[in-house]
């Protein structure tokens, strides 16, 4: 086994990065220590991929400095391959092994000069060979093929195959396998668990835990963060800054909770100070009113002096209280975002599941339903308040089932009965072309709800919806569901495009949702903790298990 590498140095100093007029990162300073495994989290569009490209040297900051030292090489996995469909598989492998290919060329060049080499040339040649051996350069291509198999790719590696003939998942797995096979000291990975099944993700986690160098990975996968990372960097979309949390994902969750508690304390302290200032002003106004304004003619002496002193003192206290109140109201402490809570009113007027006059009308019945080519014959009954997790391979009909339950599709045979109030969170994005703002589309009351939950910054409420990131539009859809009383909630990949902190809130909100829930998700942590029934859809007739 080759010796561990612990020489990586990553330092960002006052880094600012903009695209056109939009500032993505603003005066960001942070450090990554040698050997750390860093998870980068944040809202979609917050600048996580930008941060990785800056570290990889693919982009330059507008201001500030990015210093990356990794003598053992840098491997950068982007979310998409930067090659045309006509490029070959071998081109993608060469791109990922570029450091090794460069080492090979330097070794060949040094070998061509060995017959007239000076002692220092021989030393340099030895260093090149040592670096090449440390990276396992001799069998890198074999490792690409072996890694591809561990990532779930069954087809043999054909270097002459066109990239355009691979699926999107196939291209992602190829890029990841080649990046890992290069064995660089520093791994920069952008959503490495995308397009991997559970077995492949488990292998990837073990591989990264055994990695000899430093890892910086952008990911939404909470279980991956929990198992792999030692440090979390959160890219704040609103503040355009980066905050560091130690002790892995557990430390991130603890730090977020502590930050929320601090914000609640500061907000309550500000409210108490406002109340105190108002009370002080009101009290002194009352005292001031009780002081005689005119003294009897000829009245003088100590009594007159005390009266004038009381008048002056009360006026001063009123003025001071009003000035303090003005300062407090001019610089208000914003309240912490309200947690997500689904509305708990149901069709029969109850606040949850169970028997009652409306229980039957709140149940779900799927009787021998089928859609040829999209969904195999299926029968299903859900009582009010039941929870169902729908699983199965891609293309088996999970989303189709949700659209049937939402009344957006008609079955070719059989029947579907659902409660009157049904909410569906779609996997696709219905708002990506909407030119109007959030306020214009949904109204001010809804916009206030979104802002109150901390789902969007106030400035984003007046931007065109299509200009928002996919994650921001996803949160719009979530807020729409939160605001409505629902009997049946249908969630199709609800964690897509959402930062882990928002997913944690969604998970807590679902735990208190009293209606019927049907969930489709690839989120391993959400699946593992799911408390209800499970239905695995198959190509053949399926039945729900208890």
PLM region spans:
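A short, surface-exposed helix-loop junction/capping segment
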Residues: 122-130, 298-308
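Proline- and threonine-rich low-complexity intrinsically disordered cytosolic regions
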Residues: 296, 312, 323, 335, ...
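ABC ATPase nucleotide-binding domains
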Residues: 261-297, 311-319
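Interdomain "pre-motor" coupling segment immediately N-terminal to P-loop NTPase/helicase cores
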Residues: 314-329, 333
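Proline-centered turn/helix-capping motifs that create local helix->coil transitions or kinks
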Residues: 117, 140, 289-294, 327-338
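Non-transmembrane amphipathic alpha-helical segments
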Residues: 100-111, 128, 270, 274-288, ...
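An accessory alpha-helical subdomain
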Residues: 131-134, 306-313, 317
């Amino acid at each position: 086994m080759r010796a561990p590498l612990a020489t990586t140095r990553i330092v960002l100093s006052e880094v600012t990065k903009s695209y056109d007029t939009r500032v993505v990162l603003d005066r960001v300073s942070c450090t990554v220590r040698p050997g750390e495994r860093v998870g980068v989290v944040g809202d979609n569009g917050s600048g996580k991929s930008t941060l990785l490209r800056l570290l990889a040297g693919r982009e330059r900051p507008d201001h500030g400095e990015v210093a990356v030292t990794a003598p053992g090489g840098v491997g950068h996995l982007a979310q998409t391959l930067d090659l045309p469909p006509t490029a070959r598989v071998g081109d993608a492998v060469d791109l990922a092994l570029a450091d090794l290919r460069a080492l090979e060329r330097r070794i060949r060049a040094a070998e061509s000069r060995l017959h007239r080499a000076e002692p220092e040339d021989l030393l340099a040649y030895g260093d090149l060979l040592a670096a090449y051996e440390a990276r396992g350069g001799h069998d890198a291509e074999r490792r690409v093929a072996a890694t591809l198999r561990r990532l779930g790719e069954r087809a043999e590696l054909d270097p002459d195959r066109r990239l355009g003939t691979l699926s999107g998942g196939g291209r992602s797995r190829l890029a990841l396998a080649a990046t890992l096979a290069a064995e660089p000291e520093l791994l920069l990975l952008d959503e490495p668990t995308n397009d991997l099944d559970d077995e492949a993700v488990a292998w990837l986690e073990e591989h990264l835990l055994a990695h000899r160098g430093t890892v910086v990975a952008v990911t939404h996968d909470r279980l991956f963060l929990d198992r792999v990372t030692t440090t979390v960097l959160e890219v704040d979309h609103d503040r355009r800054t980066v905050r560091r949390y130690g002790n892995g994902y557990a430390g991130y969750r603890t730090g977020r909770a502590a930050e929320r508690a601090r914000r609640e304390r500061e907000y309550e302290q500000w409210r108490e100070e406002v109340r105190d200032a108002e009370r002080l002003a009101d009290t002194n106004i009352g005292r001031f009113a009780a002081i005689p304004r005119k003294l009897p003619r000829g009245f003088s002496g100590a009594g007159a002096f005390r009266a004038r002193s009381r008048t002056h003192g009360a006026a001063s206290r009123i003025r001071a209280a009003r000035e303090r109140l003005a300062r407090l109201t001019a610089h208000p402490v914003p309240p912490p975002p309200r947690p997500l809570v689904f509305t708990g009113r149901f069709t029969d007027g109850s606040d949850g599941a169970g028997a009652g006059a409306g229980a039957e009308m709140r149940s779900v019945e799927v009787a021998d339903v089928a859609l040829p080519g999209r969904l195999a014959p299926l029968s299903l009954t859900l009582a009010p308040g039941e929870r169902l997790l729908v699983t199965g391979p891609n293309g088996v009909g999970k989303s189709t089932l949700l659209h049937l339950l939402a009344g957006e599709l008609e079955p070719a045979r059989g029947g579907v009965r659902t409660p009157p109030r049904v909410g569906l969170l779609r996997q696709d994005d219905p708002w990506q072309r909407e030119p109007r703002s959030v306020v214009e589309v949904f109204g001010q009351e809804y916009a206030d709800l979104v802002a109150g939950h901390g789902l969007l910054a106030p400035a984003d409420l007046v931007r065109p919806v299509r200009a928002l990131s996919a994650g921001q539009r996803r949160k719009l859809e979530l807020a729409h569901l939160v605001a409505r009383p629902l009997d049946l909630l249908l969630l199709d990949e609800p964690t897509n495009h959402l930062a882990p902190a928002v997913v944690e809130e969604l998970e807590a909100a679902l735990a208190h949702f009293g209606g019927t829930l049907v969930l489709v998700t690839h989120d391993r942590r959400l699946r593992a903790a799911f408390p209800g029934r499970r239905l695995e859809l198959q190509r053949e007739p399926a039945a729900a298990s208890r």
